[in-house]
Amino acid sequence: MKITLSKRIGLLAILLPCALALSTTVHAETNKLVIESGDSAQSRQHAAMEKEQWNDTRNLRQKVNKRTEKEWDKADAAFDNRDKCEQSANINAYWEPNTLRCLDRRTGRVITP
């Protein structure tokens, strides 16, 4: 079977538009947007894991907050006690900065101004 040049050109003329038509339909863009509810099994599992981690660290966060608040209260009380000690009418009262207490100069005992 001998195919002549004119038959090849004719066949090419028929197949080329078909190939172009198929290639454009294969690569056609779509303008549809798929919106998921976000309620997939993976997202639920991820949310459950995050909640579990948040709950596990809750005690630690509370301890840190309580410790910080306790230290602040202690420093605040010491500041007030220092002011009271320094303004005391007792001339033997002095403020001990290392122990944060008001002491008597003569005895070294704690006094309340």
UniProtKB/Swiss-Prot annotation:
Task: Say which family it is in.
Answer: Belongs to the UPF0482 family.
Recorded GO cellular component terms are:
cell outer membrane
* Entry keyword set: Signal
Please give the Pfam families that the UniProt record associates with this protein. DUF1283
**Entry protein name:** UPF0482 protein YnfB
Q: Does the keyword Mitochondrion apply?
A: no
Give the organism, scientific name.
Escherichia coli (strain K12)
Q: Which residues form the signal peptide?
A: 1-28
Question: Gene name, please?
Answer: ynfB
